[in-house]
Amino acid sequence: MRKKQKLPFDKLAIALMSTSILLNAQSDIKANTVTEDTPATEQAVETPQPTAVSEEAPSSKETKTPQTPDDAEETIADDANDLAPQAPAKTADTPATSKATIRDLNDPSQVKTLQEKAGKGAGTVVAVIDAGFDKNHEAWRLTDKTKARYQSKEDLEKAKKEHGITYGEWVNDKVAYYHDYSKDGKTAVDQEHGTHVSGILSGNAPSETKEPYRLEGAMPEAQLLLMRVEIVNGLADYARNYAQAIIDAVNLGAKVINMSFGNAALAYANLPDETKKAFDYAKSKGVSIVTSAGNDSSFGGKTRLPLADHPDYGVVGTPAAADSTLTVASYSPDKQLTETATVKTADQQDKEMPVLSTNRFEPNKAYDYAYANRGMKEDDFKDVKGKIALIERGDIDFKDKIANAKKAGAVGVLIYDNQDKGFPIELPNVDQMPAAFISRKDGLLLKENPQKTITFNATPKVLPTASGTKLSRFSSWGLTADGNIKPDIAAPGQDILSSVANNKYAKLSGTSMSAPLVAGIMGLLQKQYETQYPDMTPSERLDLAKKVLMSSATALYDEDEKAYFSPRQQGAGAVDAKKASAATMYVTDKDNTSSKVHLNNVSDKFEVTVTVHNKSDKPQELYYQATVQTDKVDGKLFALAPKALYETSWQKITIPANSSKQVTIPIDVSQFSKDLLAPMKNGYFLEGFVRFKQDPTKEELMSIPYIGFRGDFGNLSALEKPIYDSKDGSSYYHEANSDAKDQLDGDGLQFYALKNNFTALTTESNPWTIIKAVKEGVENIEDIESSEITETIFAGTFAKQDDDSHYYIHRHANGKPYAAISPNGDGNRDYVQFQGTFLRNAKNLVAEVLDKEGNVVWTSEVTEQVVKNYNNDLASTLGSTRFEKTRWDGKDKDGKVVANGTYTYRVRYTPISSGAKEQHTDFDVIVDNTTPEVATSATFSTEDRRLTLASKPKTSQPVYRERIAYTYMDEDLPTTEYISPNEDGTFTLPEEAETMEGATVPLKMSDFTYVVEDMAGNITYTPVTKLLEGHSNKPEQDGSDQAPDKKPETKPEQDGSGQAPDKKPETKPEQDGSGQTPDKKPETKPEQDGSGQTPDKKPETKPEKDSSGQTPGKTPQKGQPSRTLEKRSSKRALATKASTKDQLPTTNDKDTNRLHLLKLVMTTFFLGLVAHIFKTKRTED
């Protein structure tokens, strides 16, 4: 079906470029394959490339899902310097250097002590499985290659041959093995991520580095196995590829394997058997697999808080969900290596402050600065010429603040935070303008400081962070979809400086940065244990190392809430290599399975039993207590913060030498249950830490987290209630329009994929012009020329009169939605299909239809795997999923159309949590194929051009639309407009139509058609000329929507062009100035900024609408044609052969579903930009 596009091609190019940028980002690391280490915007495209952060200002409109306080703090990606061009890493021995390492200055995880005991990993092999690497970075270096496991390429080839490995290359003494397991034959586009991760694990920069401090990883003397894995043929194939990499890494002698990537919310149970076997194989050989927890925060992502009545908000996915892996969360320590600036305070003291720069200021130069409020108005910048503009964060985009300052003559910009304990944010690059971000505390000091000068220092220093010790907002919460405790432990992941491609270094943030540090510590600890416990098997040493590392971790405390961060966020706490190395004791659950306690469902009174192990030759006396806490609730939302309940008293225990002993702590929260159940009606977590000290007044020696759920976790609802059950027409991801109760998306059905994410039944709306053309013999719908398009809508919803971009829910007297279909094959409300917002992962989803006696008349195929709709950010997932297998076209098991009547459409599914029972959701669906009976005659007054019908239509279902349609030629496209009846039931027919360019086209009586549609989608249409002649249309020849077996014998009515409606005009498609036809993409793409728009243009928006949903001043009168050119333009621009049913993720192919998701979403994004209806306001800081 060819439609007309009227927009300029520069706008098309913008849309194409926007689509290309996001699809390229997807192809670099694919859907959720690498945990995003620079989630620069709310879309959080998973790429570690340095990108600017833009933040939205809090909306003035109260919503159900408010912005979190620090919704975009996660990204810092700062090119540390401009280093020499890429050069191959040295393969000769390199003498040790005296230049200080980054760890010499700041070592929050206390790795240096363990490094000394384990020889910095010399003689050890470590593996990194990731999306791409710079194989020849200068940091890939051994200080003494004589201690290496593989002395030569020949040694490696011998090991490969022993295990049947026929692929993989020797790069140099450091990178002993490299292979691309993706098998796509492409060079890795993303070399940043894997290079950065590998540097944290095993980097060893030379003394010649231009960095002020030398990079040294946790195991700098270990050799590297670099294994590239990327999604090519779906998630299942991807999982099999990294499973093979795991097996090869084990066989080539890796002590530890780092996997800093993940698929959010996916369950371990759904991994291929080959992948599960690979995990088991590594464990049996004593090889530690360390994974990142993910950067997806919680259900709702980084911009929404979870609902308090849906406590299963964890999003840790695979491979992190595997129990044998050590899964790592991210936190920010209280001190950080950072750029600094110095000011003189009022008392003439030098004050140093941390800064994060974009386009750095000249070092050691004194700059004058002036306060410029929030940088919005011209008057804000009256004093900034030749100075640095000091601007407070908020209200408008960072880019605009910087651009405004530059326009006013400022030489640079300092933006200070509007939050007291926020994370630093990298500012966008605006015309190479020097800019830096500072804390609120430092910004207020500068604002009030009488001496308005500042100097930027050349050498970075370690300074306290504004946030203090704090879990990263982006770090993914547990539990896993399977209901298991994850993450296991936490490590620094905020602003980590490491190697990136081309011999450069940069700061990145993410759990991908946390994991390799823990991987290095695990490798060093296992190497220490080889000497300390020589009689243990490798698997026993691995088990001990994991338990000791978790036990010796320090539970992190939230100073603001006066409670410990949740174990579902931090695991056992912050890793401490020094404590682990010196530990002679550790603590496990009562079965000695792991160093975490999963209590599952509990009541108000329960017990926590743990086992204390003493591996020393002396008895140990300890004191212990338990903390008891739950989730903090803010209104109807989880605050993602802890709420302390109470602490038990300290108790004393003595553990004999080389022995173990159990302790049991009773917990009673009865006094809190009433207050807790009020906001958390479906249950809540009861959790905390059992902490041990050698003296109650001293620091914590070790601890173990425990988690229980007050309620029935396994049987929590998996599916959000249907939108039909919402009193205000809104849901978690969807906000109803404010101008009408029960009203849905106000921007048109074409954007349901982006906006209307809720649980409902979808169906299809087919305009009568297309139905008419098909019945008149057009076999291929693509050959139909029409200004109207087929659209996916929601069953039970109907367009407002004269405004088919606004839909509302029509209800029976009992409040149930009027969901009706007419399965007659005309494509108009012929079927229903299930769309759901899943709050939890589920399995075995099936739809079935029951008659009024409860007999099953139809059953769908089974969808085996359902993933919770944990976000709605375009980059990873949408807020709902459409299930193709659930489409019911009104037929029974034998393929026959069912009788007219009311049926129950039931969707059944089972949460994947242990002990869960099957759940279901029902919808009432009316089936009715009765064709409306319409008047057979009419009269027409030439004086007032009023058409009066002889009778009102008779329908089995309520009348949905009774209209007069008229079709005219707008250039080469048949264009249809509609006239609604006057209050007295007559229709006023126009004499002429107006084209898009404003020209007039005379209308003949033969251009008008009387069209009636009922609420089940049955349509009857009659030419007005026949009504005036008083002829009655017979069913086999008229315009009823019962599809005839053969073409009408009468010739089709001709339109204004003289062409029959089933024939295409002979004119060629209109071309614009580029020589391209309007339905073809331009070959060139304009340069864009980070928003996907050309830098000097903002997206066009439709005029603001009033409460009726109409453009003010443009509302057509009843009985008059709709003349809103805005609407007509958008309809044409959005005309496409693809129905919007293809814009939501489906579960037709579970292995490729998520891979296809972003491509489908980008199609929608492309359409939206072309139409200029997608009203995205620019991201604000």
UniProtKB/Swiss-Prot annotation:
Residues 33-52, 1109-1123, 1137-1147 have a biased composition (Polar residues). Residues 1148-1181 form a propeptide. The active site is at 130 (charge relay system), 193 (charge relay system), 512 (charge relay system). This is C5a peptidase. It comes from Streptococcus pyogenes serotype M1. It is an enzyme of class 3 (hydrolase). Residues 99-581 form the Peptidase S8 domain. The keyword Lipid biosynthesis does not apply.
